[in-house]
Swiss-Prot record:
It comes from Mus musculus. This is von Willebrand factor A domain-containing protein 7. It is found in: Secreted. SUPFAM superfamilies: vWA-like. The keyword Thylakoid does not apply.
Length: 891
């Protein structure tokens, strides 16, 4: 890669040509899509972050051709809107989704937005280059980039994305909050990312920088054309005489002489006195963001950089293994499946990007083994053997919690055991953690709940002893499969099948009644449709839309291939499957479990948010689940809408979502979806009234629409959602932890639905000392409480290790209020750990700044927020080390 500090004039002709071809003129900007405030045409932090990431990703694809695929040509993108779905389909092939990339980029963008929303961050001038804290801001910026590198090298990519979001926010704020653009600069500051380089010509304490401005727009209020300064915001720190304010409606300092301000956050003079320079500031901020991404790519290398942004359609492979003496067959089955996956997928687009292994053997569990090297994973797995013992129950949920802590989002976790959990008290917390991590958990249990033989037992066990597994599987969108030793190797084949990125098709009705038919829809964008059934099944029939039926006879039938392994059945339909309504009928003792899955290029992400119209940066406040008493916005982003699909078959249109009670499947309501912005984005929104949702009833989301030819389209999110009774926020320090340190944490809890008497419990993994000044909260309607926690990191803490802090708010006594959890992930960094950014990176790949002021629009730029400009009002999910609420996120 060329040195990041090399000016554009030093870039070679081929690179300049590349830049000219990729970047369209400014007129191609997408406008703001939310009309919460009047700032049309503003460019947001999310816009800048995602456009820069797409530019650098495309350059990586151009420079590193995929083996076996046609080389991408930059000319193919001349004059076109750059879409993540398009470049992924071109690079990996049709049918390979950009979903993981978009989800990872969403993590970065939400962490970016957190800097403007969270109380611990939004008022700190060092994090925003405010109050002439330019040197301190640069220290924070460089520190966040270093921490991004450290976390990525420790394979903690979630934390790395959070620190990257914080770094990009500060970097982008520099160009909006300082007067760099007013000084006539149109390129990024050449020294801002290099800590040993001086920031020249800084305004000093006694230097007046602004004149008084009475109006909203203040184009000529800068006094000196050579000194670098930034504006003061609010009353802390107080603005000295003669200094500039940030400005805008919510800045109290802007009413004190000299009045006005210099921020370029938006196109609205109500919020940005230098609004006329907004686009110029955005253009330079985009160049700087591309420079930062390119720097990380050069430091990490292409493989690790791709993992940082999840530039892959593949998931991770995560095993939780019971290693007691009776588990020999199960361990061998796990080894066989892991070996098969490694051998079949190595070097392909679906090669797992990450491998996680957690053994458990009562009374212990762990340690966790994580690697990105398949050979190392196989070697470690091959060392595991059944260790003797065999008392039931086991510490399964503790091991699963450890796996969830280290498994990347949007992954499958497979638990092999023949015992019930000894640590069933962790059930609710693990359920919540699966939602927070968006991981699907499948239990393969070689134990019949009614069987009495087998392991030794310390006491008589309840027939409901496996219910914790059922609850966790249901909450995560997974399943519990009971089988026997002789079938485990065949049943374990679902490990590889599930990792193919399958979607679950909605059934009507969702819960099977023996003897009653159940239907599901197949559309032309589905393939490898598979029906899985397990239970005491005596017979079944599957009927296609053409009226062709297939029964339980094993082998290849008129519809597909039927296989049976004890009480576990699979029917894989012959491709291409007939489109239309299919019917299943099952005869069984008890309630059979039926699941229909398929591969598809069309899927969706969804998130929640609430409107916030006060504060310095109004917008949509991100939530991971609805909150009781609050009007919630549901935001849907359809993935897999490539340009080719739109031209050939017409663009799919989704009209509404259906909310169903879980697990009964009864319909709670149907909510219309409204398109937001241009159709090319596939962005839809709906308002969920508080009366529609209940704290006591989890619900599922089903997306309903039509394809280009009028066929029915239905997609369902596998993880059910729940409504939080209170808003619970947990935030940590802006920096990483170090051994021997004591870190302050902040807790905030609010009730919007009425009186709440809550007990607050805390836990830490690993078991570090944690103290809190808030153990109970009695809240009335719209009342809040604040708490302070102190986390002590021992001198013996392992560097590059993850610490997870959990706070649980539960109703007191016999209260029926379900608990709400907040999770905070932190990284312990050795005091000597440094990844210096002391000089430019040297590599063969080009940086991708434009030769003319412009931004590259993309489908990922879906969050234009009115009135915020670059204020970072992304509207969904977990942000910057903080989980607002544990609950429903997209699968």
């Amino acid at each position: 890669m060329l040195p990041v500090e090399v000016p554009l004039s030093h870039l070679g002709p081929p690179i300049l040509l590349l830049l000219q071809l990729l970047l369209p003129p400014t007129s191609a900007f997408f406008p703001n899509i939310w009309s919460l405030l009047a700032a049309p045409g503003s460019v947001t932090h999310q816009d800048l972050t995602e456009e820069a990431a797409l530019n650098v990703t495309l350059v990586l694809f151009l420079e590193q051709p995929h083996p076996g695929r046609p080389r991408l040509h930059v000319e193919d993108y001349r004059g076109r809107t750059l879409l993540a779905d398009d470049i992924f389909a071109a690079y990996f092939g049709p049918g390979f989704s950009s979903r993981r990339f978009r989800a990872a980029l969403g993590e970065v963008s939400r962490a970016n937005a957190a800097q403007d929303f969270l109380p611990a961050f939004k008022s700190n001038p060092d994090l925003h280059f405010d109050a002439e804290r330019l040197v301190q801001g640069r220290t924070r910026l460089v520190g966040a980039l270093r921490e991004t590198l450290v976390a990525a090298r420790a394979l903690e990519y979630t934390l790395a994305r959070q620190r990257l979001g914080a770094a990009l926010h500060a970097l982008q704020d520099f160009y909006s909050h300082s007067n760099w653009v007013e000084l006539g600069e149109r390129q990024p500051h050449p020294h801002l990312l290099w800590p040993r380089q001086e920031l020249w010509s800084l305004a000093q304490v006694g230097d007046p920088t602004c004149s008084d401005c009475e109006g909203l727009s203040c184009p000529g209020n800068m006094l000196d054309s050579t000194l670098l300064t930034s504006g003061y915001f609010g009353m802390h720190p107080p603005k000295p005489p003669g200094k500039c304010s940030h400005g805008g409606h919510f800045d109290q300092s802007s009413s004190q002489p000299p009045r006005g301000g210099i921020n370029k956050d938006s196109t609205s003079p109500s919020f940005s006195p230098h609004h006329k320079l907004h686009l110029q500031a955005a253009e330079v901020a985009l160049l700087a963001s591309i420079e930062a991404f390119s720097l990380l790519r050069s430091r990490l290398g292409d493989k690790a950089f791709s993992r940082l942004l999840d530039i892959t359609p593949a998931s991770s492979l995560s095993f939780v293994l019971d290693t007691t003496g009776s588990m020999g067959e199960e361990i061998n089955a796990a080894k066989i499946q892991a070996r098969r996956i490694v051998e079949q997928r190595q070097g392909s687009p679906m090669e797992p990007v990450f491998y996680i292994l957690v053994p458990f053997h009562d009374p212990g569990f762990g340690p966790v083994f994580t690697t990105s090297d398949p050979d190392s994973f196989w070697q470690k797995l091959n060392e595991i053997h059944a260790l003797g013992g065999g008392d039931e129950p086991e510490m399964c949920l503790s091991a699963l919690e450890l796996a969830l802590l280290h498994t990347p989002p949007l992954s499958d976790i497979f638990v092999f055991t023949d015992a019930s959990p000894k640590d069933a008290l962790l059930t609710n917390r693990v359920e919540s953690l699966t939602r927070e991590r968006r991981c699907r958990v499948t239990f393969l249990v070689t134990e019949d709940p009614s069987r009495t033989g087998g392991r030794r037992r310390r006491e008589a066990l309840s027939p409901l002893r496996f219910e914790p597994y059922e609850a966790i599987a249901r909450a995560s969108g997974g399943e519990v499969i009971f089988t026997k030793d002789q079938y485990i190797q065949d049943v374990a084949a679902i490990v590889g099948e599930s990792m193919a990125g399958l979607v679950t098709l909605p059934l009507d009705p969702p819960v099977f009644t023996p003897g009653e038919p159940c239907v599901f829809s197949v559309d032309s964008l589905l393939w490898q449709v598979t029906v899985r059934m397990h239970g005491d099944i005596s017979s079944f029939w599957i009927k296609s839309p053409a009226g062709v039926s297939q029964g339980p006879e094993e082998g290849i039938g008129p519809l597909g291939h039927t296989r049976r392994f004890g009480q576990f059945w699979t029917v894989t339909m012959t491709d291409p499957p007939r489109t239309g309504t299919w019917e299943i009928q099952v005869a069984a003792a008890g309630t059979p479990r039926v699941r229909v899955q398929a591969q598809t290029s069309l899927d969706f992400l969804f998130h929640f948010g609430i409107s916030v119209e006060d504060g310095p940066h109004p917008g949509l406040y991100p939530l991971t689940q609805p909150v009781a008493g609050l009007q919630t916005q549901l935001l849907v982003e359809v993935t897999g809408l490539t340009s080719r699909q739109k031209l050939v078959g017409g663009q799919p249109q989704f009209s509404h979502v259906v909310l169903r009670r879980v697990p009964e499947g009864t319909q709670l309501g149907r909510v219309s979806l409204e398109p937001v912005g241009p159709p090319v984005r596939g962005l839809l929104a709906a308002s969920l009234p508080p009366t529609l949702l209940s704290v006591s009833s989890p619900f599922s989301l089903e997306l309903v629409g039509q394809g280009g030819g009028g066929e029915s389209l239905r997609r369902t999110a596998p993880q059910p959602c729940s409504v939080a009774p209170v808003l619970l926020e947990l935030s940590g320090p802006p920096d990483f932890l170090t051994p021997g340190s004591k870190a302050p944490l902040s807790l905030h809890i609010v009730s919007f639905s009425g009186p709440q008497d809550l007990d607050l419990r805390t836990s830490v993994n690993p078991s570090f000392s944690l103290t809190s000044n808030l153990s109970r909260a009695r809240l009335g309607l719209n009342e809040s409480a604040w708490g302070r926690l102190w986390l002590e990191v021992p001198d013996s803490a392992a560097p590059d290790s993850v610490v997870m802090v959990t706070v649980t708010a539960a109703g007191q006594g016999a209260s029926q209020v379900p608990p709400t959890h907040a999770f905070l992930r932190l990284l312990v960094l050795a005091q000597s750990s440094k990844d210096q950014l002391d000089g430019p990176a040297h590599s063969a790949a080009p940086v991708l700044p434009p030769v003319s002021p412009a931004l590259l629009p993309s489908t990922l730029v879906t969050q234009g927020r009115a009135g915020g400009g670059m204020a970072g009002k992304a509207w969904w999910g977990t942000v910057g080390g903080v989980l607002f609420l544990l609950g429903c996120t997209s699968w």
